[in-house]
Structures are given as C-alpha cells and as structure tokens.
Amino acid sequence: MSDIAITISLLALVAVIGLWIGHWKIRGVGLGIGGVLFGGIIVAHFTNQYGLKLDAHTLHFVQEFGLILFVYTIGIQVGPGFFSSLRKSGLKLNAFAILIIVLGSIAVVLVHKIADVPLDIALGIYSGAVTNTPALGAGQQILAELGVPQTTVTMGVSYAMAYPFGICGILLAMWLIRLFFNVKVDDEAARFNAESSQDKESLHNISLKVTNQNLDGLTLIQIPGFSDEEVVCSRLKRDDMEIVPKASTEIRTNDILQLVGDDNSLAKMRLIIGHEVDAPTVAYSGEIRSERVVVTNEKVLGKKIRALGIHQKYGVVISRLNRAGIELVPTGNTTLQFGDVLHMVGRSDVLNQAISVIGNAQQKLLQVQMLPVFIGIGLGVLVGSIPFYIPGFPVALKLGLAGGPLVVALILARIGTIGKLYWFMPPSANLALREIGIVLFLAVVGLKSGGSFFDTLVNGSGLEWMGYGIFITFVPLIIVGTIARLYGKLNYLTICGLLAGSMTDPPALAFANEIKEDNGAAALSYATVYPLVMFLRIMSPQLLAVLLWAA
C-alpha cells in the first residue's frame, strides 16, 4: 500500500476507535467527540512501534480541512443567534461567560510566566482545560505564523493531558456550587418556571374593543401604532362579520380588533383604542384561517414584505415572523430570508395563493445548497489570510484558518440571503459536516501526538501539565459561579448552563439537563452564551500567543 492509502486507512481506524471510546460513559458522562483524540494517541503508539510511515502532507491537509469544516459549520449554526445573544436579555449571562474566558486567559499567563511553561504547551493545556478543540487549532495556526516549530506534537500532547479534567472540572464546579449554597433543585426549577411563564414568548394576541370615539371613521393606517408598524391587526370583527382588515379599512366604534405585538406596544394600543375583551384568539371562524408558512421560494428571498404586495393582492396579513427561534413583528420593510416562518391570516379561498408566493416547500428545508458552502469556505480562508496591524504588536495578526471561516460564516448566516444564494443549512447536514470536520482534525492531532504521549505521561511533565489544566479549568468556573449566585442572583440551573456554555461542552450540558430533566433553564442559558463564547474561545489563544510571544 502507498503511504497515502496507509494514512487514510489509519485515519478511519482512529475515527472508529475514538468514537467507540467516546461512547463510554461513567455515571452518564463520557469523552464524547474527544474520544477521537485518544483513539489517535493509541493508534499512533502502535504505528511508532511497528515503524509504519504516514504521509505528512496528507495529514496536514486533512487536519486543516477538518478544522475549516468544523468552524465554518459552527458559524453557520450560531450565526443567526450570535448578534441577538448580545442584546439586553443576554447581557448578564454573556458578561459572566466573558469573565470566565478572561480569568482562564489570566491563568494561562500565570502558568506561562510563573511556572515557566513553554508557550505552545501552555496554549495546549488551555485548549484542553476548556475542552475547546477549535482553540487548539487556532493556537497551532498562530504559533506556526510566529515561526514556533513542532507545535502540533507538543500542543496535542498537552491538550490531551488537560482534556479529561476539563470535562470533570465543570461537573465538579456545578456540584460544589450546589453544596456551598445549599441549593434545592426543585425550588430553583419552580422559580425558573414562574419567571419564564411571565415572558414565555415575545409576542402576544389581544382583542380590543374600539371605544375611543375619535377613531370612528379613521382608516387603520391612520391610527397611531399601526402607522409605526409596532403592532399588526390580524382580523376585525364587526357585529357578526369577520374580516382580515387592510390598511385602508375604516374603523367603527364597537369594532373588535385582534392585535399582535409585544407587551409594551399592546399596552399603548389599549390606551388609544379601548378596553380588552374576551374573544377567541386562536380559532378562526367562518372562511378565515391561519397558517404557518416557511419561506422557501427563491424569488422572494431578499425582498421586503411590502414589495410582495401580499396584503394588497390577497388581503392576507402576516402577523408574526419567526427567524432562528426569535419572534419578530413583521413590517413592510422586513426582508425575507430562507427558512423564515410566517404566521399568515386570510380568507381560505385566497390564502393558498398567498402561500404559493412564499413557497412553503418543506422538502427544500432538507436540501443543501452546496454552492454557498464552498463560497463561504473560500471567503473564510481568504479573510483568515489577510494580515492586519495593531499598534504595539510586533507582528501582523491574522484570523487564520480557524478564525476566518468562523467570522465569515457568522456574517453570512446573519445576512441569510444574497440574490438566489442562501446560507441556510438543514440542522442534520450541518451536524454531519461539523462532526466529520472535528473527527478528521482530532484524528490527525492524536496521530501526531501519540508517539510521545505515554512517555510524557510516565517519564516527563505529564502530571504537572494535568495540574496546570486543573487550575485553568476549575478556578475561573468556581469564581464566576459563586459571583453569579451571590451577586448576580442567578438561578442555579441557569448557572449550570452558563458554566457548560462557557466551555462549549455538550457532555456538561447533558449533565446539567439531568439535574432537573423537565426544566429548560440550563439549555436556555447554554444557548444564550454559546455563540459569543465559541467565537472568543477561538480568538483568545491567538491573542495570548501574540502577546506572550512578544513579551
């Protein structure tokens, strides 16, 4: 067999062994995808003993391409929620997550400066301690740019030494916080449910009776609130007649209007229109019905709702828009993106015509447009290769193959659509590409690190590196967890999700979810901090490398 054939065969073997190891669980917690790294270490140990030669160029390409695939698909996944997670509702959680990253970075500086640990090893320990594989790839990239040789081997070994406690340390921090504050999980779950039920969704329906005599005879668009597009009137009831109103529909005293909007906007409309009445808000009687419609028609992508003329042509109202799990009040200037879910209300005989304009082809949600994928990857590599200079830094910085595709993917996923190209990717396809990418990357890192892993563990500084990893993992988590509980007054289950999200660690999230299985607090806080944390985890080793290398 050729060297390339042997290399590919061993990569497949590493993936099989590693994924098998990753499925081993102790009390419900396992290595997960990190098992591939240890599968590579085991295989490399025996290949070195038997003198098998691997093709270095193939390994290098597979490692870099796997990293690119992983970070690009991560960016596409979290992109729509990345910028919204920075809004006011998630500021406190994201601030605590950033504090964990900052404290972890300070710990790396202390390990490097005080303990005199070489920079490449310190960054490898950091990546393993925070269980973030893209951070390892980013660190290797920047050190290679700085001219530090043989970083793959040393960083891979130190990463592997710190990784196991990186997972266990999060679980230990959760347990100690629970013990220290004498937390009663059932009480925490009840408190979270009570708080979340008050604001379970961003938009609400109410029915208002027109009692303001000044509105009699005015058209809908002339009433304050509708002209500002703060709320949507999805239907109007007058005596026994029920219609979907247009902007030009005249309003009469005693009409009942069903409105959709956020709490503040609806409160204003109560003052303007009249008092709230009990009226059906879900069932649509007569010929009026509502449908949830998915935007799949390429002809409407990037167009504004006003330009489609759906309301004018068919008398259909778009009362809600759900984008990446976030509910919005649609306005005439709202631009449609692939995968948007619209709540449409109209007469049965014309609603289907309006739906055909939007698309609602469910099978398209299962298809992947490959052209945007490779455009995004290509742009990401180009952006990652652009040097930018910061005063005081000795070398030009680059986002690299880890940061470039991530930043581009975040932006493209946020934009959503350019012409007929859309960057929506079905979750199953995204997960498949992401898993393939990280398996390839970890398999190569394991193969390159395995030759010296056991020797370092037994005869070298392996145990010392483990100790530094415990320090980097545990100290930031326990400090921020205590502050979040003591001063931030955060729910314990929310703190568990925050700690897991700050390490981008799915096994830790699984553990947090099992603390109270019927409660979504941990998953919600994990999802809130995950996008920003993933970005910062990839960028932080690069900044640390440049700062410490220059010092």
Curated annotation (Swiss-Prot):
Membrane topology: Multi-pass membrane protein
Molecular function as annotated in GO: monoatomic cation transmembrane transporter activity
InterPro entries the record matches: AAE_transporter (IPR050144), RCK_C (IPR006037), RCK_C_sf (IPR036721), Transpt_YidE_put (IPR023018), YidE_YbjL (IPR006512)
PROSITE patterns: RCK_C
Main location: membrane
Originating organism: Haemophilus influenzae (strain PittGG)
Protein family according to the UniProt entry: Belongs to the AAE transporter (TC 2.A.81) family. YidE subfamily.
Entry GO terms, CC: plasma membrane
Regions that span the bilayer: 4-24, 28-48, 65-85, 95-115, 157-177, 370-390, 402-424, 438-458, 463-483, 492-512, 529-549
Sequence ranges assigned to domain RCK C-terminal in this UniProt record: 191-275, 277-360
The protein's name in its UniProt record: Putative transport protein CGSHiGG_02670
Gene3D superfamilies (UniProt xref): Regulator of K+ conductance, C-terminal domain
A GO biological process held by the record: potassium ion transport
Keyword Nucleotide-binding belongs to the record: no
Alphabetized UniProt keyword annotations: Cell membrane, Membrane, Repeat, Transmembrane, Transmembrane helix, Transport
Compartment(s): Cell membrane
